[in-house]
From Swiss-Prot:
It holds the Pfam family Methyltransf_3. Its EC number is 2.1.1.104. Belongs to the class I-like SAM-binding methyltransferase superfamily. Cation-dependent O-methyltransferase family. CCoAMT subfamily. Its cofactor is a divalent metal cation. Methylates caffeoyl-CoA to feruloyl-CoA and 5-hydroxyferuloyl-CoA to sinapoyl-CoA. Plays a role in the synthesis of feruloylated polysaccharides. Involved in the reinforcement of the plant cell wall. Also involved in the responding to wounding or pathogen challenge by the increased formation of cell wall-bound ferulic acid polymers. This is Caffeoyl-CoA O-methyltransferase. It comes from Citrus natsudaidai. InterPro entries: Cation-dep_OMT (IPR050362), SAM-dependent_MTases_sf (IPR029063), SAM_O-MeTrfase (IPR002935). Disulfide bonds: none annotated. Pathway: Aromatic compound metabolism; phenylpropanoid biosynthesis. SUPFAM superfamilies: S-adenosyl-L-methionine-dependent methyltransferases. One of its GO terms (biological process) is methylation.
Amino acid sequence: MAKGHKSKLQSDALRQYILETSVYPREPESMKELREVTAKHPWNLMRTSADEGQFLNMSLKLINAKNTMEIGVYTDYSLLATALAIPDDGKILAMDINRENYEIGLPKIEKAGVAHRIQFREGPALPVLDQLVEDKKNHGTYDFIFVDADKDNYINYHKRIIDLVKVGGLIGYDNTLWNGSVVGPPDAPMRKYLRYCRDFVLELIKALAVDPRIEICMLPVGDGITLSRRIT
């Protein structure tokens, strides 16, 4: 049985059924190999689940995404899902503070023949976003932006990338169910990092829910992904 990333609305058995019948049989070999490599990494709880990778890949194809951004890549599973979904001349601006983790997945990206679609920037994303926002030529130029990084900056990311994504484009925020802690009482026992980030995730969701520039959909895939579609 697959462990971790259980949907909050599903049993382990049902999730395993989904993986074995519709996810694993269609998973590209390069993504399968990267998933197996990542499972051995000491921080593998940060990984993107296989069903979420499939969801991202199909979502990008549905909107014909070409110019994309990813904030937080870990070992590149979601990044590879994106790179495989966009056209050969498509681009991904990928940002992470840890190049070593990024390079774990790089051989699989190169093997898949999509490394040329990725521009990797090591370091905090906020300064890069500030530079992009400052130049209005960048406004409304991104088809899809995926955020899977420091939860305490999620709201700061949103304030910037909402200008960068085009009208009709999508923003995906990962981990928005945050291990189910979002529905727990304030005094519920939980690990320190869960409690710390929980409030920032809740802050983001409240902000998205009342933002008139977007429409949102929260899905129980992986640890929860909230899609925001810019409408104005």
